[in-house]
């Protein structure tokens, strides 16, 4: 029921004295810098990456737990730039399937950069896959659809903003549980080698994990775009549904052999490695999704992460589950 005009007039009269107290302050100029000093109480070490050590910390001002990533000492200037860019991307890209970055700073007494980010409780997909293999099991199709669907959502968000991740792989996908509602979430992490297509000028540095790198990323023979990430996503999807890497025979070989395989060998059909209980329709559907994502020619891959997500969900959502395909 709409308010009557007289009622609105009454509210306006009652709030006018309060509004008068909220006149713009004149002791802070628009061009001034507001300087603050943040302090975090370190609770313990959580993990370690190539460029930094991650600590569980507590923010006493906002009364919340955070993950504090501190850059390792002695790294070259290029590594420091990557470290800072990881934080900037985390603050700039806001999506439920990306970890939020709260703050970025510098420790002058130690000469180390740091940033504070969302504190996540869970495990990365690499660990979950290893645990499933130890038990001779696979992740369920339902888990793959939910977890990896979120990753593709995050990639779509980044790609629409001109950011290519360049390091999509299971160890950079974190599976966590929301402490408030108990829901499972996936978070795409580590934008340390990400590429901003709008800002980057000149030659592109070749970087990435040989186990997941796209041919054009390894060779540096053509411009990169979001479809570069879809190749790595296809390799990851193969690993999630089969429990093993498509080029598992080369994982202990020199990196050059693995890079050659990424550029020259077709990715196997995942359907051939699935249990007999999986229907022909699901096998064929997964073959199509993975092989299209992993085509050596970027122009033949999915046009977007959203398209790949739709195709994957069309296959997996109707797939029946069996206990011998579920990792506990």
Where do the model's predicted regions map?
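Short N-terminal regulatory/linker segments that flank and modulate the kinase catalytic core
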Residues: 1-44, 135, 275, 314-315
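Conserved N-lobe ATP-binding subsite of Hanks-type protein kinase domains
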Residues: 53
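AlphaC helix of the eukaryotic protein kinase fold
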Residues: 72-92
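Activation-segment/catalytic-loop signature of the eukaryotic protein kinase fold
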Residues: 104
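Conserved short submotifs of the Hanks-type protein kinase catalytic core
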Residues: 110-124
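Activation segment signature within eukaryotic-like protein kinase domains
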Residues: 147-148
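Protein kinase catalytic-loop region centered on the HRD/HxD motif
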Residues: 151-163
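C-terminal lobe helix-coil module of Hanks-type protein kinase domains
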Residues: 160, 174, 211-327
């Amino acid at each position: 029921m709409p308010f009557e005009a007289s009622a609105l007039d009454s509210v306006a009269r009652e709030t006018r004295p309060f509004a008068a107290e909220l006149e713009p302050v004149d002791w802070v100029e628009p061009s001034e810098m507001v300087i603050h000093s943040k302090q975090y109480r370190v609770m313990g070490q959580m993990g370690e990456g190539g460029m930094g050590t991650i600590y569980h910390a507590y923010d006493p001002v906002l009364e919340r737990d955070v993950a504090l990533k501190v850059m390792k000492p002695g790294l070259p200037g290029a590594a420091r730039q990557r470290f800072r860019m990881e934080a900037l991307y985390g603050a700039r890209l806001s999506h439920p399937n990306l970890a939020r970055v709260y703050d970025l700073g510098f420790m002058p007494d130690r000469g180390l950069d740091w940033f504070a980010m969302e504190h996540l409780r869970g495990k990365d997909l690499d660990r979950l896959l290893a645990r499933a293999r130890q038990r001779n099991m696979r992740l369920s199709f339902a888990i793959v659809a939910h977890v990896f669907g979120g990753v593709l959502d995050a990639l779509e968000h980044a790609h629409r903003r001109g950011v290519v991740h360049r390091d999509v792989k299971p160890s950079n996908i974190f599976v966590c549980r929301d402490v408030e509602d108990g829901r499972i979430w996936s978070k795409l992490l580590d934008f340390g080698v990400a590429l901003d297509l709008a800002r980057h000028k000149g030659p592109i540095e070749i970087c990435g994990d040989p186990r997941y790198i796209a041919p054009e990323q390894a060779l540096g023979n053509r411009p990169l775009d979001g479809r570069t990430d879809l190749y790595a996503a296809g390799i990851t999807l193969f690993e999630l549904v089969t429990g093993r890497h498509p080029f598992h025979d080369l994982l202990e070989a020199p990196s050059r052999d693995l890079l050659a395989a990424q550029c020259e060998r077709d990715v196997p059909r995942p359907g051939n490695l699935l249990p007999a209980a999986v229907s022909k329709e699901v096998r064929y559907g997964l073959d199509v999704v993975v092989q299209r994502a992993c085509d050596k020619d970027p122009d033949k891959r999915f046009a977007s992460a959203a398209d790949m997500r739709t195709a994957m969900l069309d296959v997996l959502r109707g797939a029946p589950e069996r206990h011998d395909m579920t990792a506990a």
